[in-house]
């Protein structure tokens, strides 16, 4: 029977994953809070102390730091000497390590954190197990992100958990532990940048970097311009997160944390033009992110309008010369690598909330046409573009999009009809190829009726209302194609 060690601070999905492992004939070992939650869910699990024959000591500071754990993880199964030594010491092989670390970054993000609290959230045993298992990836599966649970289970079931995939998991581990260690160094060095002010001039603010990874705002290379403001940093982060969703050349413009224009194209110049045309008024004074290098031709277009921040993976020398003619525009060079499914958190009175990032993308084949009329190919393209954008828009959110750009955005309204009215009234075009995209279900048929009055012929929405059929009937009445995804994307 294969053995797995599970010790996680982020409990998302761990019970379901553990149950599936037991069904796949894995014997589970765990520690502390992870073991408690598995016990409560009646998942068969043993204490790591059953491996080490040594109790947890020092309030849990020493749990897994033991040869019985690390010998079982690090043994090279192709070396008879390693296996003989394990046998002599009565040490069992460990086949899987599932670990994520104490929430150090979240802890130190609290401005009132004490030194003792920070120190107690420095994980020792977790990184040690992760690094050991990652080093031995040829024989051991290492999982650090809950987002990888399902893929691992799928591969276990179809016998495709091969060395190449385990190597990809190994890379994620070393990226994760490197960022974790860097966050610790930055905190104890006092690595925080005082900003001119916060969201408003009467608010003081500073920027604490918990990572210097090149794919993050914190790790961006600023090539030109004034110091980033508090609002610049928030807007830039939102812009970057959205533009990374696109494989094709794409441009995203953001104002006040909401996209105002998103465009794609065969070239990055086309993509920018489409984003600009989506809302040429709101882009003024905004943040723009592009997922391709900025060329001289594109730089001339960008230079012609007032922008606070321009983000790209690269700027050519000639493009920099053009853009630097404006002394204040901030130019950020950022690696466009997709973020892992890290947690995000927000402070509230007396604490903070933590959740996984909303990175889930419903595959097209899992979406369902629920109307008599099916979408055309062009309507499908419009829907899929809008569905990538809508999670980045404040709820209630309605987007209108064609297959190359957003054409109208209604954001942050207290009711869905209100959001639809704004999107429809601001639309730069409405025709048979434009889709209406909703981040949440329609509580009744009125939004669909309003869309029909404006000539909309395709709608995509999550569904889930007890009155879903009213919206479907309304769509059928007006010959509208409707697709449901089963997944909502609220953003507060």
Swiss-Prot record:
It comes from Staphylococcus aureus (strain USA300). Pathway: Purine metabolism; IMP biosynthesis via de novo pathway; 5-formamido-1-(5-phospho-D-ribosyl)imidazole-4-carboxamide from 5-amino-1-(5-phospho-D-ribosyl)imidazole-4-carboxamide (10-formyl THF route): step 1/1; Purine metabolism; IMP biosynthesis via de novo pathway; IMP from 5-formamido-1-(5-phospho-D-ribosyl)imidazole-4-carboxamide: step 1/1. Belongs to the PurH family. Its EC number is 2.1.2.3, 3.5.4.10. One of its GO terms (molecular function) is IMP cyclohydrolase activity. This is Bifunctional purine biosynthesis protein PurH. Pfam families: AICARFT_IMPCHas, MGS. Keywords: Hydrolase, Multifunctional enzyme, Purine biosynthesis, Transferase. One of its GO terms (cellular component) is cytosol.
């Amino acid at each position: 029977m294969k053995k797995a060690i599970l010790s996680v601070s982020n409990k998302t999905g761990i019970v379901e994953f553990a149950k599936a492992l037991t069904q796949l004939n894995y014997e589970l070992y765990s520690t502390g809070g992870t073991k408690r939650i598995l016990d409560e869910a009646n998942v068969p699990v043993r204490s790591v102390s059953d491996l080490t024959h040594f109790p947890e000591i020092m309030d849990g500071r020493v749990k897994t730091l033991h040869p019985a754990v690390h010998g079982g993880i690090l043994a090279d199964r192709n070396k008879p000497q390693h296996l003989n030594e394990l046998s002599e010491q009565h040490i069992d092989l460990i086949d899987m390590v599932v670990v994520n670390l104490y929430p150090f970054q979240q802890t130190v993000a609290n401005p009132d954190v004490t030194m003792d609290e920070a120190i107690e959230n420095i994980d020792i045993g977790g990184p040690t197990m992760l690094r050991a298992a990652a080093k031995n990836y040829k024989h051991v599966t290492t999982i650090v992100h809950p987002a990888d649970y399902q893929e691992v289970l799928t591969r276990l079931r179809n016998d495709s958990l091969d060395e190449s995939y385990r190597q990809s998991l190994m890379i994620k581990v070393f990226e994760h532990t490197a960022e974790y260690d860097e966050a610790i160094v930055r905190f104890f060095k006092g690595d925080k940048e005082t900003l001119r002010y916060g969201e408003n001039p009467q608010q003081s603010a500073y920027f604490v970097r918990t990572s210097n990874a090149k794919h993050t705002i914190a790790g961006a290379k600023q090539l030109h311009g004034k110091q980033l403001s508090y609002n610049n940093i928030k807007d830039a982060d939102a812009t970057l997160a959205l533009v990374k969703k696109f494989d094709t050349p794409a441009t995203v413009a953001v104002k006040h944390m909401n996209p105002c224009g998103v465009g794609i194209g065969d070239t990055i110049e086309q993509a920018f033009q489409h984003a600009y045309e989506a809302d040429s008024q709101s882009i003024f004074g905004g943040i723009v992110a592009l997922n391709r290098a900025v060329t001289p031709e594109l730089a001339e277009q960008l230079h012609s309008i007032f922008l606070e921040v321009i983000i790209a993976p690269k700027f050519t020398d000639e493009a920099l010369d053009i853009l630097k003619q404006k002394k204040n525009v901030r130019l950020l060079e950022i690696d466009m690598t997709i973020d892992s499914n890290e947690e995000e958190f927000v402070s509230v009175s007396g604490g903070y909330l933590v959740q996984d990032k909303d990175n889930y993308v419903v595959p097209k084949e899992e979406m369902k046409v629920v109307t008599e009329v099916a979408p055309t190919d062009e309507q499908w393209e419009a829907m899929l573009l809008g569905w990538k954008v809508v999670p980045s828009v404040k709820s209630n959110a309605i987007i209108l999009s064609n297959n190359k750009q957003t054409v109208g955005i209604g954001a942050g309204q207290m009711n869905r009809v209100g959001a639809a009215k704004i999107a429809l009234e601001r639309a730069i075009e409405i025709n048979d190829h434009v889709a209406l995209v909703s981040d949440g279900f329609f509580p009744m048929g009125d939004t669909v009726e309003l869309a029909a009055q404006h000539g909309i012929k395709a709608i995509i929405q999550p569904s889930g209302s007890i009155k879903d059929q009213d919206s479907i009937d309304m769509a059928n009445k007006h010959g509208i194609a409707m697709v449901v995804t089963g997944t909502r994307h609220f953003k507060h």
